[in-house]
Amino acid sequence: MARLTVEECMGRTNNKFKLVILASQRAHDLNSGACPVIKHKNGKNTVIALKEIAAKQLDVSSLFNLSVQRCRKYMEKFINSDEQCVTNKSKIDIFQQNAITSSFNELGNNSNNQGSNLLGRDNFFSTPENRNTSNTDS
C-alpha cells in the first residue's frame, strides 16, 4: 500500500528526500490536529500524508515552506540555548575560580585547620602515623 503511494507521490516531486520532508511535515500537522483533506479508514498519519500528496490535494511549496520554518525555529532555539549554556558556563567558571582561590587563601591563613598544618609541613608525603608524631614534636 505505501509503496504504491510513494510511487504516486514521485510525480509531484522528483526527489525522494524532499518527499520525506513533505510527508513528515504533513504528518506533523495531522498529529497536531489538522483535518485530513482526503477520507481515510483508520490509516496512520504518515500514510494519510502520502495519500494527500499523491492526490494533489496539498500545495507542495507551502508545505515545504512550513517545514523550513519549523526547522528554523528549532535551530534558533538550539542556537540560543547553546549560547546561553556558554554564557552560564563562563559565569560558573568565574565563581568556581573565586571559590578555589578563597579556599586556598583560607587554608594558608588558618593555622588551626588540619589542612593548613599538613600543607605547611615538610611531611606532606609521609604516612598518617608519622604526621601525628611530627605534630606533637612541634
Curated annotation (Swiss-Prot):
InterPro entries (UniProt xref): DNA-dir_RNA_pol_omega, Pol_omega/Rpo6/RPB6, RPB6/omega-like_sf
Organism: Ehrlichia canis (strain Jake)
Origin organism lineage: Bacteria, Pseudomonadati, Pseudomonadota, Alphaproteobacteria, Rickettsiales
Subunit and interaction comment: The RNAP catalytic core consists of 2 alpha, 1 beta, 1 beta' and 1 omega subunit. When a sigma factor is associated with the core the holoenzyme is formed, which can initiate transcription.
Region ranges (Disordered): 117-138
Substrates-to-products reaction catalysed: RNA(n) + a ribonucleoside 5'-triphosphate = RNA(n+1) + diphosphate
The family this protein is said to belong to: Belongs to the RNA polymerase subunit omega family.
MF GO annotations: DNA binding; DNA-directed RNA polymerase activity
EC assignment: 2.7.7.6
Protein name in the entry: DNA-directed RNA polymerase subunit omega
Annotated SMART domains: RNA_pol_Rpb6
Superkingdom per UniProt: Bacteria
Keywords: DNA-directed RNA polymerase, Nucleotidyltransferase, Transcription, Transferase
Entry GO CC: DNA-directed RNA polymerase complex
Gene Ontology BP term (one): DNA-templated transcription
Described purpose of this protein according to its UniProt entry: Promotes RNA polymerase assembly. Latches the N- and C-terminal regions of the beta' subunit thereby facilitating its interaction with the beta and alpha subunits.
Biased composition (Polar residues): 124-138
Matching SUPFAM superfamilies: RPB6/omega subunit-like
